[in-house]
Amino acid sequence: MPIIIPSPWTGKEPQIHQSAFIAPTATIIGDVIIEEGVNVWFGAVIRGDWCTIKIGKNTSIQENVTIHSESNKLVDIGANCIIGHHAMIHGPCVIEDGCLVGIGANAIHNSKLGTGSLLAAGAVLVNKETPPRSLVMGIPATIKKQFPEGSVLEGAKSSGLYAENGKKFKELFEKNPEYSK
């Protein structure tokens, strides 16, 4: 079973939409708001013990992602995003709608990834805002190009597939509770 507990500091409990899939080994603590269709995969840690974390509709938080923030700050992840395996989001931070944060990438400390942007695998975005539809790469991350107006990242389109996959896993664990032990 996932660890879903209130903040020991504030007593605030996670608010998780009933359609969300939370993997049995995920951990969600405190002031966390998870919207419809979100899927939080195995080993992910979302720690809102002294901050607020919002995760928008149909966003995928993949295996071993860590999301946290400085005290009394906000992490705001939009709808239809994919936060790739082993990524770290440390706030205050904003990931706008339709973004893809690549495998092992970091968006930290006053960063803002603009709508429809891609933070490449392994990149580190620190204290920087990017405009919409940016390809952001490197350490420290820099904008390499702008995607055309109206373009949608393939990864962002895939958020719907991850939402469907989350539904299937949710059904599997509900039908077979012994799998969660």
Q: What is each of the regions a protein language model found here?
A:
Residues 2-40:
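N-terminal segments that cap or nucleate solenoid repeat domains
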Residues 1-15, 49, 55-57, 63-65, ...:
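Glycine-rich hexapeptide-repeat left-handed beta-helix
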